[in-house]
């Protein structure tokens, strides 16, 4: 839980910071993993609800020895039974309220998290036999450090070998696409409500996901890798002063969202933050950024990603290096090649110098690692 992580003891959530600066705060769904409880309960003025979608009484597709969460299929029958749909409707309704002050609304949709249950009509959008599956050379993992599975083997997810053995890759991918389309519809409900609300012309919108998701790429499923499929997410901004349809190719991190909104809303700077505002790139997407995107997975394992390269360094010193200009799928590990030492060393300057011990909360599944934000060294 957020409130149990020692490194965050004195750090206000984004909701609390905006509330302390005279914003009315609304939140619903999976914004924090365990919700705004304990000392965080007062961060939210109005709840938009946090319910669970129904599950079938029996598994629909998962093999018997797989985790209970790793099931998927056409369930329930209608959108109205889905928690994400109900949340979208609650948020849409709230947008027509008069808050008498600026508002900060956070909406956390559950899908496309497993289990991948959504109503039949979302599956019907796709022909399961027609979409392309990821390229997956059998030799892809041959140039990786011997112990890379130490952090990449996410126990809750099936291995790629298990997915292939049971012939489930296409079926699982179909369910993921259906889930994305369903949640896209939920986002659309809120956007349409905003367009017809009194807040249409003075509201900033940010859309992102908390992590990426492997669908067999690099012979992996789900998350918790330091590769592109797990660490890259959509990040969209819209609103006053932001040009529509522009794309910025500079690296960014999710911790940059907080200081970006603080700057765009002209609030006092929060000195607790490690992120760097993206406001310059929102004004001009060609504005370069000095900082790469730094991702950590468990204590001591880090990825450094700039526009063209990714360096992965594990806590035992093993490394991976990928050239995204020529190898966007990260098939060819260039770590250790003398010709790339200068590039490797430049990226390594950003590696965090200190990692806190892995933190375990009340349950074995609630784990987090923290680090001091890196500056070049």
Model region roles, listed by residue range:
Residues 1-314, 318-319, 328-355, 359-363, ...:
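Formylglycine-dependent sulfatase
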């Amino acid at each position: 839980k957020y409130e149990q992580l020692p490194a965050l003891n004195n750090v206000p959530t984004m909701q609390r910071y905006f509330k302390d600066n005279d914003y009315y705060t609304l939140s619903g769904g999976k914004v924090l993993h365990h919700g705004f409880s304990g000392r965080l309960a007062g961060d939210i003025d109005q709840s938009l609800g946090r319910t669970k979608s129904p599950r079938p009484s029996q598994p629909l597709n998962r093999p018997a020895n797989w985790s209970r969460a790793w099931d998927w299929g056409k369930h329930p029958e209608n959108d109205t039974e889905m928690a994400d749909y109900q949340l979208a409707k609650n948020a849409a309704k709230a947008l027509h309220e008069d808050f008498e002050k600026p508002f900060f609304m956070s909406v956390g949709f559950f899908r496309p998290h497993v289990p991948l249950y959504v109503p039949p009509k979302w599956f019907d959008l796709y022909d399961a036999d027609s979409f392309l599956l990821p390229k997956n050379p059998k030799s892809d993992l041959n140039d990786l450090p011997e112990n890379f599975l130490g952090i990449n083997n996410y126990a809750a997810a099936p291995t790629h070998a298990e997915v292939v053995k049971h012939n489930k890759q296409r079926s699982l991918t179909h369910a993921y696409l259906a889930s994305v389309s369903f949640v896209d519809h939920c986002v659309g409900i809120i956007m349409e409500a905003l367009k017809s609300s009194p807040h249409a012309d003075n509201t900033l919108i940010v859309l992102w996901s908390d992590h990426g998701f492997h669908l067999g790429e690099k012979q992996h499923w789900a998350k918790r890798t330091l590769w592109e499929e797990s660490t890259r997410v959509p990040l969209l901004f819209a609103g006053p002063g932001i040009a529509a349809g522009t794309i910025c190719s500079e690296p960014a991190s999710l911790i940059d969202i907080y200081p970006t909104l603080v700057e765009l809303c002209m609030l006092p700077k929060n000195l607790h933050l490690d992120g760097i505002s993206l406001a310059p790139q929102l004004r001009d997407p060609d504005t370069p950024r000095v900082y790469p995107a730094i991702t950590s997975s468990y204590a001591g394992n880090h990825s450094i990603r700039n526009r063209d390269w990714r360096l992965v360094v594990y806590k035992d010193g093993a490394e991976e290096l990928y050239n995204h200009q020529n190898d966007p799928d990260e098939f060819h590990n260039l770590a250790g090649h003398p010709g790339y030492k200068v590039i490797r060393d430049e990226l390594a300057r950003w590696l965090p110098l200190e990692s806190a011990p892995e933190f375990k909360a009340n349950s074995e599944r609630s784990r987090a690692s923290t680090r001091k934000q890196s500056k070049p060294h």
